[in-house]
Structure formats: structure tokens, C-alpha cells
Amino acid sequence: MITSKEQIINYFKSGIKETKDFRIGIEHEKFLFDNKNNKRIDYSKIKQMFAALLEFGWNPILEKNNIIGLNKGGKNITLEPGNQIELSGDKLNHIHEACAESQDYLFELRQVTQKL
């Protein structure tokens, strides 16, 4: 039970990181559409896309026998409830690393989605 304002303040203070430990990270959420009919792609296409991304060094995240995401280093690509995918990027030191990570991710996505 909270009995004082100081308890709340101390709780938030306990989560403060030192400046030397600051990092940045990116998240990209993508809704994917079929260019032939402009409809959202279904799980079977996402499964194909995830399988193709394995060639870029991604590792599968499985639920039973279904691939529901990928990881590589500190990055994850996950299947979200609306059938969209989301990249959760690595913890990086500066914006230039985040830019490079985004460019690499988008390059890989373009390579595999053009073949679907």
C-alpha cells in the first residue's frame, strides 16, 4: 500500500538510468498489402516472408509449428494482432546506427516482398 508521496517519487527515481547507459531504439510497424489486389496479405504470405528473411540471418520464433516472428542480434520482428509486422530494433548508441538499422531492415523487406 502506498502511504506517502515519497514512495511514488522513489519508485520513479529507481528507474532513472545514468547518462552513460542511455540508448536509442526504433520500432517500425508495417501493414503489408498485395500489389495485385490491394488487399492486406494473410498469414500464409507472412509465413513465406518470414521464411525468406531467414536467408538474411534472422532466426525463427516459433509457436508450435508456426513462425510468429524472427530475431537477429538485439532485433526482433514480430507478428502483431492485426496481422501487421513490427521491427523492434536493437539498443543503439546514436541516430546514425538507427538510420543504418532501418535501411538494412527495409532493404531486406523489399528483397523478400518483391518475390511474393
Which residues make up each language-model segment?
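Terminal catalytic/cofactor-binding subdomain
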Residues: 1-116
